[in-house]
Amino acid sequence: MARQIAHPASICAWNTDMYGVDATKPGAQEYYDSIIELYASWGVDFIKVDDICVKYGQAGNENTIQYGGDEIELLHNAILHSGREIVLSLSPGPAMLEQAEHLRANANMWRITNDLWDSWGNIMEMFGRCDSWSPYVSEGCYPDCDMIPIGHLSIRGCEHGLSERWTRLTKAEQRTLFSLWCIFRSPLMLGCELTDVDEWTMSLLTNDAVLGLTKHSHGAHQVLRTFDFIVWQAEGEHGEQYVAMFNIAGWPDTFSVSTEKLGLEGAWEVTDLWTGEKEGTIDRTLTAAVETHGVKLVCLKKA
């Protein structure tokens, strides 16, 4: 069966004993139906499929990049046929923006970046990617910013010549990453060793106010971007506004954004989501001192 439906030119570039399925072959759908039926019988709730969101080096040409749309549809149909609700996650990235509607129709999560690691350069790239993909975030459809590289990493790995280590991101950069992922509503997947999570890392992972953005906000979008400053905004379930002010410069600085730019009128009470501190009321301008590569993440409620 596998030999009959395999696509001889669809070979995983980094694991060449893996072949894709030719969706035009008789039995292709039935093959995936049988696989997903088995997983469903085991009670599986989440399936991640690699070498499909984008497929590198197809047909022996290392420079080709293709979209695995036909196989994605086979998987989507197989999940429907199984009768079980199963989350379908696709990688690697970056996903093709022109395939956004097809992805939304056939998957729940799809990677919008290459493998993301603990470097500020990787985090910087995500601001642009999140801006491009923000219109396509909706319930059940989540562009995926990739794993969160905090804590103890690469215990048995050697990615790009880097072996076991604690994250190279500063504490400010870790908060920036977590704030962007949460306001954008990316899936949150940890890339660290869970048995030795330190107190700082645990404080990031257990901040209910910040995590709540993934469930209780919508409409996240980039409000403005300059050479040293980025602002994101989202709306809460009861009209509250969430604002993230990111310092992307190499030095600490003070930034301001007007309530007019945020589309707000009147007075608003300010609460810092990371500290929980109430910081008074604003009516014209939100101003914050932000450390290097750091973030000011606040909730605004009508006063």
Language-model regions: role of each:
Residues Q4, P8, T24, S34, ...:
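Glycan-recognition surfaces
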Residues T281-A303:
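C-terminal beta-strand-rich structural cap/linker in extracellular carbohydrate-active enzymes
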